[in-house]
UniProtKB/Swiss-Prot annotation:
Subunit record text: Part of the 50S ribosomal subunit. Forms a cluster with proteins L14 and L19.
A GO biological-process term: translation
UniProt name for this protein: Large ribosomal subunit protein uL3
Function: One of the primary rRNA binding proteins, it binds directly near the 3'-end of the 23S rRNA, where it nucleates assembly of the 50S subunit.
Modified sites of kind N5-methylglutamine: Q151
PROSITE patterns per record: RIBOSOMAL_L3
Organism: Rickettsia canadensis (strain McKiel)
Keywords of the record: Methylation, Ribonucleoprotein, Ribosomal protein, RNA-binding, rRNA-binding
Length: 215
């Protein structure tokens, strides 16, 4: 199991293949992605690499983190993330990770934060059908209906689907196919959509359920 990388979502586009089919693509950019540190089985209980991306002003870094970046002999990074790896896949600290870490035709898993939707009703948040449009229903057309029972149990059970904050959740999309890799522009083109807003950060790693590569 090797490390993943941190990328930044640029936006979406589309291309046509040889059959005339339109393929939706998400463009992600990999820029200044470096190894910041190691986590070892002997010291931390597991093997992992700490990856950082995008340079950050030294004035905006806390004193403890300044020492971390100084020990790694790299410039401060905006985003840090750990990736679990097997023992034989350690990479030297300060080594750079480029877009050619992946290849066209490879399947990957992508983890990102979904776009926040604010306070949403039950129909939007949980796909409820709502109440009747007429026949005695007044004002409550988009409500979720009953929330509990009666004096016993006298409470609303945890996990009850109700209106509330929607979005801003960490989501992993599995088995997305890499359409192409543009090394000059530092871009990876991925088939399909990816969670998150424009310029948000996401992590890309090898698919754990589908490892076949078709070029």
């Amino acid at each position: 199991m090797r490390t993943g990388i941190i990328a930044q979502k640029i936006g979406m586009t589309s291309v046509f293949n040889d059959k005339g089919e339109r393929i939706a693509l998400t463009l992600v950019k990999v820029d200044d992605c470096q190894v910041v540190g190691h986590k070892t089985l002997e010291k931390h209980g597991y093997n992992a690499l700490v990856i950082g991306v995008k340079d950050k002003k030294i004035s905006r870094v806390t004193k403890p983190m300044k020492q971390v970046f100084a020990n790694a002999k790299i410039s401060p990074k905006t985003k840090l993330k750990e990736f679990r790896i097997s023992e034989e896949n350690f990479i030297d600290v300060a080594a750079s990770l480029e877009v050619d870490h992946f290849m066209a035709g490879q399947f990957v898993d992508i983890t990102a934060i979904t776009i926040g939707k604010g306070f949403a009703g039950s129909m939007k948040r949980h796909n409820f059908r709502g109440l009747e449009a007429s026949h005695g229903v007044s004002i409550s057309h988009r409500s979720h209906g009953s929330t509990g029972q009666r004096q016993d149990p006298g409470k609303v059970f945890k996990g009850k689907k109700m209106a509330g904050h929607m979005g801003c959740n960490q989501v992993t999309i599995q088995n997305l196919k890499i359409f192409a890799v543009d090394k000059d522009r530092k871009l990876i083109m991925i088939q399909g959509s990816i969670p998150g807003h424009k310029n948000s950060y996401l992590s890309i790693k090898d698919a754990i359920k589908k490892i076949s590569i078709t070029i």
